[in-house]
Design a protein with these regions (language model features):
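Classical Sec-dependent N-terminal signal peptides that target proteins to the secretory pathway
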Residues: 1-20
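Generic detector of N-terminal low-structure segments
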Residues: 12-14, 61, 91
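The N-terminal extracellular segments of secreted preproproteins, especially immediately downstream
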Residues: 13-16, 46, 106
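Alpha-helical segment of the N-proximal tetratricopeptide repeat
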Residues: 20-28
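Extracellular/secretory pathway and lumenal proteins
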Residues: 21, 51, 110-113
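Short N-proximal segments of mature Sec-exported proteins
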Residues: 29, 34-84
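Compact alpha-helical subdomains of small soluble proteins
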Residues: 71-137
Length: 137
């Protein structure tokens, strides 16, 4: 009986917490950026995958959805390991940082005016860290 109560309580709490998560695709700016990734963030398939994850993660970071942030960190971790399996950035210990290094080296960083108009502190922070850590020559 206690197990059933615990399971129902867990399911109820999960539904309530997921019900509070804001849908990024109902946000006009986010939806437009996501649909136009190829134009805004040109690059290869890896660049597009990474930026999709970063956009989603940034949206949830801006909206304080910690569970969703963890999900996208997990996705970036897996992708960083895949990139390393292919022989890139082997000296890096953090797989999420591998995706950041890949993005910095091979992908497009949007113009500052686009970032300002997008109004995402988390996304701006991501690109500012790329500019600081991995300046383009």
């Amino acid at each position: 009986m206690m197990k059933k109560i615990a399971v129902y309580l867990f399911l109820f709490v999960s539904m309530v917490s997921l019900g509070n998560v804001k849908d990024p695709f109902k946000d006009e700016k986010f939806d437009s950026a996501y649909k136009n990734i190829k134009e805004i963030f040109p690059g290869d398939f890896r660049c597009r995958f990474i930026i999709k994850q970063v956009l989603l993660r940034s949206f949830h970071e801006d909206n304080k959805n910690t569970e969703m942030i963890d999900n996208f960190d997990s996705s970036l971790t897996t992708y960083g390991r895949i990139i390393q399996e292919e022989g890139l950035f082997l000296n890096e210990k953090d797989p999420v940082e591998v995706t950041t290094q890949y993005y910095a080296k091979y992908c497009t960083v949007p113009e500052e005016k686009w970032l300002d108009s997008f109004e995402s502190p988390a996304l701006s922070k991501y690109f500012n860290s790329i500019k600081e850590k991995y300046p383009r020559k």
